[in-house]
Amino acid sequence: MSDSPERLHLRRQLEAHLTELGYSCVRMKRATLPVPEIVRVSPVRGRIAYGETVLRSDLRRRSCHERLLFFSQRRTRHRSSILFFIGVGEADEPELEALLEQLDIRSGTRGGHVHVVPIALSAPTRRRTSPREARG
């Protein structure tokens, strides 16, 4: 996946969210494929959390669907589910929720370990001109 400014913003905000929840330790990546964008471990409980970012354009891609399915089905050695956080723009949250139901990742009885984190996308900032530059 490309590292567009939107995706970088989503990733930073999702990492901040995981840190607030106590998943502050960066886990060493293993040689499993595919590799999640974010892997964190709670230093207190030792629980693993995965994180992925999803853009509007990703919602229709088969590769995104496969990644979401793969990471939502991952288990620890002791067969407990791994928490999975998906960072998405606020405007795209309903579409992602519908996709998760369509892929049978979340429903009324399953998918409690999959958490959608809506993130406000920042507006593009304009560079201010100083009074000196305006005078020419």
Can you annotate each of these PLM segments?
Residues 47-65, 90:
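Short beta-strand-loop-alpha-helix junction that forms the active-site gateway
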Residues 72-81, 105-108:
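Arginine/glycine-rich "motif VI" loop of SF2 helicases in the C-terminal RecA-like domain
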Residues 90-136:
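Domain-level recognition of nuclease-like catalytic cores that cleave nucleotide substrates
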Residues 9-12, 61-71, 99-101:
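Well-ordered, non-membrane alpha-helical segments in soluble/globular domains
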Residues 36-50, 76-79:
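Active-site beta-strand-loop-beta-strand hairpin of nuclease catalytic cores
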